[in-house]
C-alpha cells in the first residue's frame, strides 16, 4: 500500500541551500583609500596655488626701438592652457574632498561599500583623464617657453622669466604626482571589487 505521507514543506525549505551572504569588505581598503584621497587633495591644492602665484615682471626690449626696454609681466592667466590647468585641478581638488568624506562614511557604514567602489572606479578614471589632459596641455606650453620653437619663430622666455617658469614647472610636477595618485586609487578600487567577487563565489 502506497504511503500517503506528504513531505513537510518546512523540511524541504531547510534542505534548499541558502545563497552565501555577501562577503564583508575589509575596512583597511577604505583606510588606504582615505589616505590616498587626502594626498590627492594636498597635491591638487598645492599645484593650484603654485600655478596661480606664477607671476613675474621683467624689462623687455621693444622691437624696432633700440635701447628701449619696458616692463612686461608674465602671468599664468596669459595662457589658456594654464587657465585650463587651474580649472581642471580645482575640479579634482573638490572631487577629492567629496570622495574623502564619502569614504569616511563607508568606513562607518560598510553596507554600501561595493556600490561606492564601483562608482569610485568610474569617476576616478574620468578625473584622471581631466588631470592628465590639463597637465599635457600646460606641459606643451611650458616646453615652448623653455626651449622655444625655431620653425614657428616662437622664442623661449624662461631665460628671462626664470621664476615664472620655475612655478610652472613645479606645478606640473605636482600635478603628475596627483595623476599617479589617481592611478593608484583606480587600481585599489578595481582590486577591492575583484577581491570581493572572489570571496562571494
Curated annotation (Swiss-Prot):
It is found in: Cell membrane. The chain crosses the membrane at residues 30-50, 81-101, 125-145, 168-188. Pfam families: CASP_dom. Residues 51-80, 146-167 are extracellular. InterPro entries: CASP/CASPL, CASP_dom, CASPL. Its main location: membrane. It is a multi-pass membrane protein. Residues 1-29, 102-124, 189-201 are cytoplasmic. The keyword Membrane applies. Residues 1-13 have a biased composition (Basic and acidic residues). Keywords: Cell membrane, Membrane, Transmembrane, Transmembrane helix. Homodimer and heterodimers. Belongs to the Casparian strip membrane proteins (CASP) family. This is CASP-like protein 1D1. The lineage of its organism: Eukaryota, Viridiplantae, Streptophyta, Embryophyta, Tracheophyta.
